[in-house]
Amino acid sequence: GNALISNNEALDETYKHLNDLASGARQAIPTGYCDLDRALNGGLRNGGLYYLAARPGGGKTQMSLQIMDNAAKQGIRVLYISLEMTETELTERRLCVTGGLTLNQLEHPDADAWKKIASASQALYDRPIQFNRISRMSVALIERLARQSKAELIIIDYLGLIQHGQGKSIYEKVTATSNNLKIT
């Protein structure tokens, strides 16, 4: 994009933004977590870059999947980029939550579990979600996929695995990647 904007362009963009606010256009994507939405003034803002941090096994992927499903349920186009799990593994987690199943019940279903799987599949069907199938990602590839998918919400799980030539430590890699994502 252009690094400079004129005064008139800034005024025009601000006027359009205020007009959108007045007309009730969606200003935030609700996460589905009431306390988080309240803290974020209604949810995730357009152009925002948000981080979900916790120790390994802290539920980051599950929470991001629930945010994704909540947004998609409202018709928001979502691109979910996982650099650790396949779309099948992610969908299994979603089926477990939606169907009230354990992973063991999902992998070894009895007749009742099959009914829950079918019901959960139906509930999740037709949501505007796309998953990546490439395990090695760069910021440039994420940008291309975002344009291709016309996503309104992009979730990346997780930043530390994005390929980046700069930096040696995980902190340096995440910082460099975050800076590049925020600019784009």
Regions found by a protein language model. Name each.
Residues 2-101:
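The Walker A/P-loop phosphate-binding site
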Residues 161:
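Residues immediately C-terminal
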Residues 38, 62, 70-150, 164:
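Cytosolic-facing regulatory segments adjacent to core modules
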Residues 51, 153-155:
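Structural motif
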Residues 173-184:
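Substrate-engagement module of ASCE P-loop NTPases
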Residues 67, 142, 181:
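Aromatic/hydrophobic pocket-lining residues that form π-stacking "cages" and hydrophobic walls in ligand
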Residues 158:
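Walker B catalytic acidic pair
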Residues 167-172:
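Short glycine/threonine-rich loop-to-helix capping motif typified by GTGT followed
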